[in-house]
């Protein structure tokens, strides 16, 4: 990150997360065990808040600045704009000179320990009101957040060998930041280019396969095993989403005993498909069961047709009975007749009232249903041009209408230098990542996380009998997906309404 970008002044968003004004004070609400991120208004006397991490009866605070980064207003004209997006830890400053070179305070992190008690804590003009409810550790959240990780983007950016010791060291702060937001699925690749080459960096297989001269197959799970263990150590999981048995274009590859790369088009239902995947599924199942990972593993697919999914699902159950299937799709689950999709993710732009009626029956069967956005819709989303409250909406909205969580296709598929320009190709800037290379969160990720926390609170309050279905129905009616897609919602009012609900 250059000093130029650090010192450029851009417009600061003066919204507040989980906070409210009270005279010349600003008040935040938090549950016991919660970490709150709130914006500091421009007119707040932030000089009164200590820069270094300060503790008061089980509550600590830390201040962050927001450093601006460039993005293309129009990918064709390349006119650049600035947005304050990168969280910068101000407690790491060494002296006054360092401080002058840092952005001003913009975000306050409030950490309430699990041993804290109900009451009010004061930090200068900031008051933190602790509510007598407990938010469990992030590993115990039930909300299913799935943000696809990209190891090869880290390898390229830091110029380290994929899956070397140096690579894992570079990945760790990014993966831990994602885990802090509640990411529950580790993105694993079973082949090269599961989605073609749509990012700056290509995905490759984590399982090397060799076809022997006698026609048998050999599989090397070394990288797969190391990566799963690494991801879980960082806090991501326990689920393992394996992409995919149905790549875009159907092309798969392997090596022969001479090390030559061979390719074939393996369309579901064909002999080529069965030859390529049959022995693998049997051996992969054996390996997963030996590791104790089978129950948490999904064969995952992305926007595949019902015809393809039907053939793949039947083949999976033939070769690996009990293997789960995950699917990000733009159709209702009922269109996949006779197919058990254990984790179905619905595109927001194709959401319907009829689809919402399927959520409760799926949950009763033990199946997950989540919501996703990608390069569309234009609103709400998590682009650089998106309002911060859009990210909060995407995190919290699933909880008020019966979804189990949220998915986005790119957590860290960075462009060449995301600290200079977040634009890549024809994608809208910010579409390809939410966390920066050194593990810094974007403000878009922070707002999404706060929405996830609100959703988790809604779940806990419902289970405790503190919320009834009617209240959520009213919220869904007032802040529903149709008005959101039509840009008719005041997202700030939605955020305020949700925070009033969960912190009452």
Tell me what each language-model feature is.
Residues 251-254, 265-269, 273, 277-331, ...:
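Catalytic domains of carbohydrate-active enzymes that cleave complex glycans
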Residues 104, 169-170, 222-223, 307-308, ...:
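Short, glycine/acidic-rich beta->alpha junctions
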Residues 33-39, 102-111:
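Short, solvent-exposed loop/turn segments enriched in Ser/Thr/Gly
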Residues 343-427:
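Catalytic-core region of carbohydrate-active enzymes that cleave or remodel glycosidic bonds
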Residues 3-15:
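Sec-dependent N-terminal signal peptides
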Residues 22, 43-99:
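Surface-exposed binding patches on compact interaction domains or structured appendages
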Residues 50, 92, 97-101, 108-118, ...:
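Aromatic-lined carbohydrate-binding surfaces of glycoside hydrolases
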Residues 20-42:
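Beta-sheet-dominated interaction scaffolds and their linkers
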């Amino acid at each position: 990150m250059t000093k130029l970008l650090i010192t450029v002044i851009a417009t600061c968003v003066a919204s507040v997360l989980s906070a409210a004004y009270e005279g010349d004070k600003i008040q935040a609400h938090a549950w016991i065990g919660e970490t709150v991120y709130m914006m500091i208004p421009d007119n707040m006397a932030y000089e009164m808040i200590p820069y270094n991490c300060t503790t008061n009866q089980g509550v600590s605070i830390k201040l962050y600045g927001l450093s601006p980064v460039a993005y293309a207003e129009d990918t064709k004209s390349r006119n650049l704009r600035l947005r304050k997006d990168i969280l910068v830890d101000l407690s790491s400053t060494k002296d006054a000179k360092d401080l002058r070179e840092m952005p001003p305070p913009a975000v306050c992190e409030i950490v309430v320990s699990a041993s804290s008690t109900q009451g009010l804590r004061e930090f200068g003009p900031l008051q933190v009101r602790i509510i007598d409810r407990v938010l469990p550790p992030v590993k115990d959240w039930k909300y299913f957040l799935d943000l696809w990780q990209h190891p090869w983007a880290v390898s390229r950016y830091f110029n380290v060998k994929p899956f070397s010791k140096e690579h894992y060291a570079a990945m760790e702060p990014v993966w831990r930041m994602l885990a802090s937001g509640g990411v529950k699925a580790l993105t694993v690749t079973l082949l090269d280019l599961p989605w073609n080459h749509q990012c700056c960096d290509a995905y490759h297989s984590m399982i090397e396969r060799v076809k022997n001269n006698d026609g048998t197959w050999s599989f090397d799970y070394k990288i797969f095993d190391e990566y799963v263990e690494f991801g879980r150590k960082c806090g991501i999981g326990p689920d393992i989403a394996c992409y995919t048995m149905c790549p875009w274009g159907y092309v798969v590859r392997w090596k022969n005993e001479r090390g030559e790369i061979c390719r074939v088009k393996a369309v579901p239902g064909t002999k080529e498909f069965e030859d390529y995947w049959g022995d693998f599924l049997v051996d992969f199942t054996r390996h997963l069961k030996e590791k104790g990972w089978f129950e948490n593993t999904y064969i995952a697919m992305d926007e595949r047709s019902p015809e393809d999914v039907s053939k793949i699902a039947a083949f999976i159950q033939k070769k690996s009975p009990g293997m789960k299937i995950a699917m990000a799709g733009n159709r209702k689950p009922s269109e996949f007749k006779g197919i058990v999709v254990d984790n179905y993710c619905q595109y927001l732009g194709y959401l319907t009232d009829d689809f919402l009626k399927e959520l409760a029956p799926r949950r009763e069967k033990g199946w997950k249903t989540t919501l996703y956005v990608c390069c569309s819709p234009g609103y709400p989303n998590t682009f650089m041009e998106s309002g911060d409250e859009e990210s909060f909406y995407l995190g919290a909205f699933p909880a008020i209408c019966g979804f189990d969580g949220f998915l986005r296709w790119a957590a860290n598929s960075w462009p060449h230098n995301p600290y200079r320009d977040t634009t890549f190709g024809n994608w809208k800037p910010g579409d390809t990542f939410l966390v920066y290379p050194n593990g810094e969160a974007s403000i878009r990720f922070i707002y999404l996380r706060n929405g996830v926390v609100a959703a988790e609170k809604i779940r806990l309050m419902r289970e405790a009998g503190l919320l009834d279905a009617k209240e959520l129905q009213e919220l869904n009616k007032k802040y529903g997906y149709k008005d959101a897609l039509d840009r008719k919602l005041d997202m700030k009012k939605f955020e305020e309404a949700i925070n009033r609900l969960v912190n009452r």
